[in-house]
Regions:
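Short recognition helix of helix-turn-helix/winged-helix DNA-binding domains
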Residues: 1-59, 89
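Winged helix-turn-helix DNA-binding recognition segment
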Residues: 24, 41-100
Length: 102
């Protein structure tokens, strides 16, 4: 029996353009991994914002917390995610932005 029961379609843009831009041009493969992880979570939640701390993202992707923090900064700067937090110690929510789908 397969371990995973749900497949998630990934936009062509994410595979054909975004990977090349983030991994090749920006030299931030960690940012691409974090984006793919958030993309998957958001798709499973019908594109609602995803609550995830640095620790959760680090443990889920196998990256260090500092690598995740750098990745999130890049993704926010490139407007690929939006992050909100009620206060400084609250778990932030991340909204995956897909500007190419407009």
């Amino acid at each position: 029996m397969p371990r995973f029961r749900q497949t998630i379609p990934v936009d062509d843009y994410v595979l054909d353009v975004l990977m090349r831009d983030i991994v090749g041009h920006d030299r931030q493969p960690a940012a691409y991994l974090v984006y793919l992880y958030l993309f998957g979570l958001a798709a499973r939640q019908k594109w609602k914002p995803v609550a995830a701390s640095l620790r959760t993202l680090a443990e889920s992707t196998g990256l260090s917390k500092s690598a995740v923090q750098t990745a999130l900064d890049l993704l926010r700067r490139r407007e690929l995610i939006g992050t909100e937090s009620e206060h400084s110690t609250a778990t932030p929510t991340h909204r995956v932005l897909r500007h190419w789908r407009k």
